[in-house]
Amino acid sequence: MINAKKMLGDGKEGTSTIPGFNQIQFEGFYRFIDQGLIEELSKFPKIEDIDHEIEFQLFVETYQLVEPLIKERDAVYESLTYSSELYVSAGLIWKTNRNMQEQRIFIGNIPLMNSLGTSIVNGIYRVVINQILQSPGIYYQSELDHNGISVYTGTIISDWGGRLELEIDKKARIWARVSRKQKISILVLSSAMGSNLREILENVCYPEIFLSFLTDKEKKKIGSKENAILEFYQQFSCVGGDPIFSESLCKELQKKFFHQRCELGRIGRRNINWRLNLNIPQNNIFLLPRDILAAADHLIGMKFGMGTLDDMNHLKNKRIRSVADLLQDQLGLALARLENVVKGTIGGAIRHKLIPPTQNLVTSTPLTTTYESFFGFHPLSQVLDRTNPLTQIVHGRKLSYLGPGGLTGRTANFRIRDIHPSHYGRICPIDTSEGINVGLIGSLSIHARIGDWGSLESPFYELVEKSKKAQIRMLFLSPSQDEYYMIAAGNSLALNRGIQEEQVVPARYRQEFLTIAWEEVHLRSIFPFQYFSIGASLIPFIEHNDANRALMSSNMQRQAVPLSRSEKCIVGTGLERQVALDSGVPAIAEHEGKILYTDTEKIILSGNENTLSIPLIMYQRSNKNTCMHQKPQVPRGKCIKKGQILADGAATVGGELALGKNVLVAYMPWEGYNFEDAVLISECLVYGDIYTSFHIRKYEIQTHVTTQGPERITKEIPHLEGRLLRNLDKNGIVMLGSWVETGDILVGKLTPQVAKESSYAPEDRLLRAILGIQVSTSKETCLKLPIGGRGRVIDVRWVQKKGGSSYNPEIIRVYISQKREIKVGDKVAGRHGNKGIISKILPRQDMPYLQDGRPVDMVFNPLGVPSRMNVGQIFECSLGLAGSLLDRHYRIAPFDERYEQEASRKLVFSELYEASKQTANPWVFEPEYPGKSRIFDGRTGDPFEQPVIIGKPYILKLIHQVDDKIHGRSSGHYALVTQQPLRGRSKQGGQRVGEMEVWALEGFGVAHILQEMLTYKSDHIRARQEVLGTTIIGGTIPKPEDAPESFRLLVRELRSLALELNHFLVSEKNFQINRKEV
């Protein structure tokens, strides 16, 4: 936990701890279990049969969730769901004799949340992300029409996202728009909702305006409720003629209009009461005539210049749809399906004169399948990204504008994507995705939490003057509350108590940023990085970087691969420990005790009169193929305290996040090998296993029962060389510990097939006729190791489902570990958006070296710094060098300039000066060019002309590795329509020669290469076949005569538009045209 003392200028102000990073997910799931379940179960209606003799009902007070029988780890390996069974008491009541049969019944499984804040569904870790939606309520806006006149509208948004728009025209008539083309008078709508004219005029502030557009025709329409409903129905459903009033017409209108557009919900009722100054009870969640009339009054006031317009992008007008809301919606859907099942079962039982027991009326299928399909297919339920510990923890804190009821990447405008002042302390202004979803997927700030009404709350210190002594208390404010306070920014200069009265501070008030006197401040921020997300808070010296580069850095830290030997960063921000702890990657002691035994698989701890065995994760594959592994950190016999680290996980060291390595870097050009973000590295990084990582790939095969018989797993595979089968055991499955190469058989499998007599080869028929040998009719369908898959087999799993039918096949999974050193084509990055690709690996002796003889590890291009304005990397680089020489680690909170001007530079120079004195190396800090040093060319031994910045920044190796990207194709599949090669590595696709590539080839005048690209290698079917033949037998390749397939396709498409394409040959001699069809 980070202490908030000193960061705020005064040590007496108390401390503040950062909340758990998984807390948002846990609180949401707890709210669903504690409140949402009961709410939805209590809505389940009493179900009666047609004759009203039997009644079925649920007693929700006694619901019970049973602890899962399976462990999390087993659920992952066996592709099962980690869920809890839900039991509820149900009663079947006979109304004739008032007898009741009560029984505890099982109604389905609910997936549980684990300690990481995720769920395991079908063996896959999934996380539900929070969605930002427009909050239900009423919003007033004005737009200019084509004449440049302001048109005022009031939009009522329902809980379901449906909209009802009120608008006022230039004659001051008020209309309710029910569709894009249809609108009806406000009087008709109010009458249809049950008000008469007298009530309407009594409940409005401007009755004369309402009377002004009351014509005789209008009076007839609102003469009775039935007339108003008929008029409304006619306009809403666009029905011609004269419809007749009936009960079914009312029901249809209720279902299509009032339920979708007038259900406000709990939040909507509160918002409308607050906006229109009403006092309607909270349990009244539907739109009332009173609301409509108050909204119309407000709209008239707007027309006459009273009242304020609403900012739709302000966070007070948004609500967060959390895990609890999404799971509760799904439970409601499942119970509605269950209701239909129970009705059908009761009806069938009565017809057959049977009275089934209570459990037989209910099936668990609706609930179980609803949740499985939600976690499997809902856009807000995503596969947990487990590249490294940071990625796991950040994924659950995402906020998305996308998803059902939200926006799409194509329709969202710039104003929605932009940063809004109300995001301060709630949504990170930096951390968002790049590309089409920029600004639509954000990340929660560190201290933000979701309030009871679905609003995002942020904490502030309140300054209370009490007997001339300032007292501090912490408040959590929603976006609608903090508008009324002057809030001092936490990154302002530290306040000197002596001259406080004279100081002015930057502050925020009503969405504006001002500079005000200290006495006027009501609240102040509690942390300097309160408004950043976790990813952005891990960037040291972030205040010296351009925001675009900080955005790239927070995204790239999530792509860092855990290395085989992790290392703590020398320069950090102080959040690294909490990120590691909350990610659940290190093993932590649950109580104090003594270590009895430790090895790579488990740690045995004794304490509190019991012995606890803590299993460790060994070579577990994440869904990004990275290796999750725990290493014990405590010796046998050691006494430990509760909360102490027992074992480090992937990318953690001593309980701190460790994503990369501190390497010696020089910023200088080197023979053009670091042009345009390329990076030159020393071979020490390869041979020293500095950037070596382990990757685990999973290959699986299923065995089905076909119509010809079951498929067989066997080692006896005819027609295959013994070399390919060398690693199989007697069952036909690869042995643990085997080294396998591309093309090797991992699982031998034969699929039976029917063979006709005519399909046998002549020699096979001869063998059958003479010797009576039965020729094999099985087809070889083995699991082979694909290209680029070499490695060591570390695990084999044979998952046998119950009742191995064709729908429930057996699955064999083989896990292969690969050791990957860093190589040319891999991507590396710092923590300031400074990314690059390895262009060359130089021998150690050729690398530039320092004045103490040490060769540098990496050479970056200095031109990558000034134009991109990420100067933080220079501070980190120099301070890292000082830290490595002094053997110190620095944890620096951002915005340290609040203490004094140029604080970062002073800190770096003072540490370099101290390192220079302690190590007696004057080159570490040379006053003529501080931070730079003269270094030597490794090839010649001569010094370079200019002094160069050298240092030890923290550099990460990213998951974009050349082994996963490199691809070649000689021949492969073609698209059916265009007959051109497919696209993409996974489909063995080709490389596209587009329009600009054709221009380049034309520019060089390479006619033959260009013709090959457009014909043989692409979509000329006959020429392709001829090339293959002539290549085998030798000879000249024939030239393609006719047009390629894509041109034929163009001709066919033109024909479908009734356009015939012809071309003509014009004779040079007599200019006669010879017509010839294409």
Curated annotation (Swiss-Prot):
Top EC class per UniProt?
transferase
Biological process terms in GO annotation? DNA-templated transcription
Q: What EC number(s) is this enzyme filed under? A: 2.7.7.6
**CDD domains under this entry?**
RNA_pol_B_RPB2
InterPro entries linked to this entry: DNA-dir_RNA_pol_bsu_ext_1_sf, DNA-dir_RNA_pol_su2, DNA-dir_RNAP_su2_dom, DNA-dir_RNAP_su2_hyb_sf, RNA_pol_bsu_bac, RNA_pol_bsu_CS, RNA_pol_Rpb2_2, RNA_pol_Rpb2_2_sf
Specify whether Membrane is a keyword of the entry.
no
Q: Which GO terms describe its cellular component?
A: chloroplast; DNA-directed RNA polymerase complex; mitochondrion
The chemistry this enzyme catalyses reads: RNA(n) + a ribonucleoside 5'-triphosphate = RNA(n+1) + diphosphate
Which keywords has UniProt assigned to this entry?
Chloroplast, DNA-directed RNA polymerase, Nucleotidyltransferase, Plastid, Transcription, Transferase
Show the Pfam families listed in the entry: RNA_pol_Rpb2_2 (PF04561), RNA_pol_Rpb2_3 (PF04565), RNA_pol_Rpb2_6 (PF00562), RNA_pol_Rpb2_7 (PF04560)
- Its domain of life reads Eukaryota
Principal cellular location given in the protein's record = plastid
The Gene Ontology terms for molecular function here are: DNA binding; DNA-directed RNA polymerase activity; ribonucleoside binding
Q: Can the keyword Chloroplast be found in this entry's annotation?
A: yes
Q: Which SUPFAM superfamilies match?
A: beta and beta-prime subunits of DNA dependent RNA-polymerase
Q: Where in the cell is it found?
A: Plastid, Chloroplast
What role does this protein play? DNA-dependent RNA polymerase catalyzes the transcription of DNA into RNA using the four ribonucleoside triphosphates as substrates.
Q: How does it assemble?
A: The minimal PEP RNA polymerase found in etioplasts (PEP-B) is composed of four subunits: alpha, beta, beta', and beta''. Following differentiation into chloroplasts the PEP-A RNA polymerase in this organism has been shown to be composed of at least 13 subunits, including the PEP-B subunits. When a (nuclear-encoded) sigma factor is associated with the core the holoenzyme is formed, which can initiate transcription.
Cross-referenced NCBIfam families, in alphabetical order? PRK00405.1
Q: Mind telling me which HAMAP family this protein's record contains?
A: RNApol_bact_RpoB
Q: What else is known?
A: A second beta-like protein with a slightly lower molecular weight has been purified with the PEP-A polymerase as identified by mass spectrometry.
Q: Belongs to which family?
A: Belongs to the RNA polymerase beta chain family.
Protein name (Swiss-Prot/TrEMBL):
DNA-directed RNA polymerase subunit beta
Q: Which organism is it from?
A: Sinapis alba (White mustard)
